[in-house]
């Protein structure tokens, strides 16, 4: 299904280590509104999305979120590569280091491990798409918060790219919701669950 290209979706070229920045950016790897949760959310939801166009949107965006997770991991890796024990202690990276050395491990900025409870796959297209719309806005806000904390242009450049993609994803999920609602009863979108209650094979 996937063709992997051996390059990042957007370049990440960071010349100076910064473990303090790494500790907050890692939240977009394994935090509640990060790229790992996003990719798992969309790639799980697509199986019970009754409309092919919307399934395609979920697949496209879920796949792109995997690429974004790779970018976040590259950023964190470059920010911590080659740190000395003295630097690790000085900048408060020691707690992470004890458990993971300098390996990538999904956690929030708070240190909370990634968990599948960060996302839902409900099997109702209206419910799932509203979750997706909210998820993209929460991710955008997180990137906004990161950009307020960091002023290194080498870090900010790929972060701004990722933030902009969240806006695009939000717009595409809005399109997916419109497609879904157009296929439902306009007087009551909630009259039935088109995934569970409609006859199998119906694309109406």
Language-model-detected regions and their locations in the chain:
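Non-heme di-metal
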Residues: 1-204
């Amino acid at each position: 299904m996937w063709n992997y290209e051996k390059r990042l979706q957007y370049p990440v070229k960071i010349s100076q280590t910064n473990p303090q920045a790494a500790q907050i950016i890692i939240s977009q790897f394994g935090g509640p509104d990060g790229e790992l949760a996003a990719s798992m959310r969309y790639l799980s939801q697509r199986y019970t999305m009754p409309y092919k166009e919307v399934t395609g949107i979920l697949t496209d965006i879920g796949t792109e979120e995997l690429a974004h997770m790779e970018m976040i991991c590259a950023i964190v890796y470059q920010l911590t590569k080659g740190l000395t024990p003295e630097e690790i202690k000085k900048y408060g990276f020691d707690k992470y280091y004890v458990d993971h050395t300098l390996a990538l491990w999904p956690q929030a900025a708070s240190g909370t491990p990634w968990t599948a409870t960060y996302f839902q796959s409900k099997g109702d297209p209206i419910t799932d798409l509203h979750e997706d719309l909210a998820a993209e806005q929460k991710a955008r806000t997180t990137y906004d918060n990161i950009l307020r904390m960091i002023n290194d242009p080498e870090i900010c450049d790929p972060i701004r790219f990722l933030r902009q993609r969240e806006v695009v994803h939000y717009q595409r999920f809005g399109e997916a919701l419109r497609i879904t609602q157009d296929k439902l009863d306009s007087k009551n979108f909630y009259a039935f669950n088109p995934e569970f209650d409609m006859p199998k094979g119906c694309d109406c």
